[in-house]
Design a protein with these regions (language model features):
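Catalytic core of DAGKc-family lipid kinases
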Residues: 1-69, 73
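A generic local structural motif
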Residues: 43, 57-59, 83-85, 121-124
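Glycine-rich phosphate/pyrophosphate-binding beta-alpha loops
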Residues: 17, 21, 72-86, 150
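A generic structural signal for short beta-strands and their flanking turns/coil linkers
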Residues: 51-53, 67-69, 92-97, 131-133
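ATP/nucleoside-binding phosphotransfer catalytic cores, i.e., glycine-rich phosphate-binding loops
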Residues: 59, 63-65, 90, 100-171
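Short acidic/glycine-rich loop or secondary-structure boundary segments that cap or lie
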Residues: 21-24, 65-67, 79-82, 106-109
Length: 171
């Protein structure tokens, strides 16, 4: 994925996250000593400190403005340890899978979180799941996580670079 910032260009292979997704990644880094449980711990901690943000995104040609908790764009099924965030993702299909969570109360969010491990969260009406070729996050100055690194800030414009890399693996 090609990521256009206001004054630079970056690239991502797998994941771009905003909102709660970026906050969870920052917190998980502080709890590396928890091993595989650090992402689950960070997610529960973030749920307890729940705060939605104004989410302004463009997906293909549609503009969505709402209070949201997170936005993630993924090329593969998994994020964190065993979380099936994008259960229909394929690395080589030329699309990025977008998962958006609109504002929810803590109890509903806990329910959705437990469904992420099976991929069933995409059936919740507060979760929007799409496969797209490009998107933008139009908020200003919000932190991002890019391929597991806490890096960059919004706004960004992202486009899929289909077949830009040659992988030597069966997909």
């Amino acid at each position: 994925m090609k990521i256009m910032h206001q004054d630079s260009v970056d690239f991502a292979v797998n994941i771009i996250g905003w909102g709660m997704a970026a906050k969870i990644n920052v917190l998980a880094e502080r709890f590396r000593w928890l091993g595989n449980w650090r992402y689950s711990f960070a997610a529960v901690n973030s749920i307890l400190r729940l705060r939605s943000q104004q989410m302004n995104v463009r997906i293909d040609d549609e503009i969505i403005e709402c209070n949201g908790l997170f936005f993630m764009a993924l090329n593969t099924i998994h994020t964190g340890k065993g979380m099936r965030m994008a259960p229909h993702a394929k690395l080589n299909d030329g699309l990025v899978d977008v998962v958006m969570l609109r504002q929810a109360n803590r109890l509903r969010l806990l329910k959705i979180f437990t469904q992420i491990f099976s991929g069933d969260h995409v059936n919740d009406p507060l979760v929007e799941y799409r496969q797209v070729r490009n998107f933008s996050i139009q908020t200003k100055g919000d932190a991002l996580t890019i391929d597991g690194e806490n890096y960059g800030k919004t706004p960004i414009d992202v486009s899929v670079l289909h077949k830009a890399l040659k992988l030597f693996a069966d997909l």
